[in-house]
Amino acid sequence: NIFLELPRQVGKTTSALIRYLYIYNFGSANSIITYLHKDMKASKENLNDTKRLRDMLPPYLQMAQEFSIVNGKKKKMPTTVEKIQNPITHNVINTLPSARNAMLASNLLRGKTITMLWADEWAFIKYNDIIYSNGMPALNTAFRNAARNNAPHGFIITTTAGILSDEAGVYAYKMVQNATRFNEQWYDLSYKDLMELIDANVNSIFVHIRFGYDELGLG
């Protein structure tokens, strides 16, 4: 579970898109990936950008066939502005709308089987606190099941810094303060030691990764 905070226009969204395209085409099977953004239009745009990146691959790597064989029968795979399904791996990428009120926010993720959730511009998603608190029980169950199958799983947040006069920005800021801070010394740790370090934080499941313009060679 990663909270990635980068300045604008340095590729944080594109990096996430590439990661999820790899998982969708090659890195898993029968997984459900869900894109969340501050509005449905932006969620759809991220899905459309995923398709555009896929179309840049050589044809034999795109896996964009219209039909698949499911239980011995030919079946047309869904390909819409809100959802796609891989005909080979049967992975799915869904999009979610933002919540217009607290009630919709409380039900947005509740009860859903999602093995990978990506929340883009989390610090600007209204009612993000309600979405998180009500959605995590179902998400954690799906994550544990995926982990038992050695399948990719988790919650990735990508965002620019929020506005501290806004409730969504304040909640995102609190999440950052509670998260485990990434540093380059982790590259020298074993996987076991790394997980023990992350699990020792009882206040957060997230690793906070933050780079500024200067650290990215752009300052």
Predicted regions and their residues:
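Phosphate/NTP-binding elements of NTP-utilizing enzymes
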Residues: N1-G219
